């Protein structure tokens, strides 16, 4: 729906950056460089993802196998043994769920691989209302028509069926904040191993 709205408002050559809202990126300079490279590739008509350079053999993330800036395949969350193989190979990146693309590129791929999703999205956007205070950049979708859009992840609906996807290897201080271990990595521990943000009184801890 967002891609349709942006294409209508800004044209098919508009570049969109699709990313999760609940992840953390700590190295903004590196992120800016990666985003600029991704936008450059996207402007050439490529569907682009950011591949997070793995810091350890993680089993909680999907992986991207790559040859340079070309995606070879997306793989599901691996076993510990497979994750160690991926890390040692130097060809695999964590899949952080970020995509960069031209609006017309995405619409063409949706038409090709999942036309039902595109059709339902168009129907929902057609009856959407302008979002107050957004200057025409935002809309509020009608709940009933939006609910008719098939609920299928973009990985299954599109990425696994699309050839020629590009990847930008990225070391950007990324975390999905998806586990206690990942939360612990975001803050320094005191001498007793406690990690605290804000005012706190620790007693016997």
Where are these regions (language model features)?
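A residue-level structural signature of the nucleotidyltransferase/glycosyltransferase Rossmann-like core
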Residues: 16, 72, 91, 98-99, ...
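A short, charged helix-loop
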Residues: 66-93
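Nucleotide-activated chemistry modules centered on ATP-dependent adenylation/adenylyltransferase
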Residues: 58-60, 77, 127
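Structured helix-beta-strand junction loops
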Residues: 44-45, 89, 161-164
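A conserved mid-domain beta-alpha-beta active-site/ligand-binding segment of alpha/beta enzyme cores
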Residues: 87, 92-101, 110
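Left-handed beta-helix
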Residues: 101-205
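Glycine- and other small-residue-rich loops at beta-strand/loop junctions that grip anionic moieties
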Residues: 50-53, 72-75, 98, 147
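Conserved beta-loop-beta/alpha segment of the NTase-like Rossmann-fold superfamily
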Residues: 1-68, 100-101, 108-113
């Amino acid at each position: 729906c967002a891609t349709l709205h942006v294409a209508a408002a800004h044209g098919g050559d508009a570049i969109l950056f699709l990313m999760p809202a609940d992840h953390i990126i700590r190295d903004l300079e590196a992120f800016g460089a990666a985003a600029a490279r991704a936008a450059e590739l996207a402007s050439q008509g490529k569907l682009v993802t950011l591949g997070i350079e793995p810091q350890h053999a993680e089993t909680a993330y999907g992986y991207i196998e790559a040859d340079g800036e070309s995606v070879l395949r997306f793989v599901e969350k691996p076993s510990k043994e497979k994750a160690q193989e991926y890390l040692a190979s130097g060809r695999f990146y964590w899949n952080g769920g970020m995509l960069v693309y031209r609006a017309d590129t995405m619409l063409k791929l949706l038409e090709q691989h999942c036309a039902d999703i595109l059709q339902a999205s168009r129907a929902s956007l057609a009856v959407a209302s302008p979002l107050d205070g957004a200057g025409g950049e935002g809309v509020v979708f009608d709940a009933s028509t939006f609910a008719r859009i098939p609920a299928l992840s973009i990985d299954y609906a599109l990425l696994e069926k699309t050839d020629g996807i590009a990847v930008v290897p990225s070391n950007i201080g990324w975390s999905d904040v998806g586990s206690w271990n990942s939360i612990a990595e975001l803050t320094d521990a005191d001498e007793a191993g406690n990690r605290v943000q804000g005012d706190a009184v620790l007693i016997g801890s």
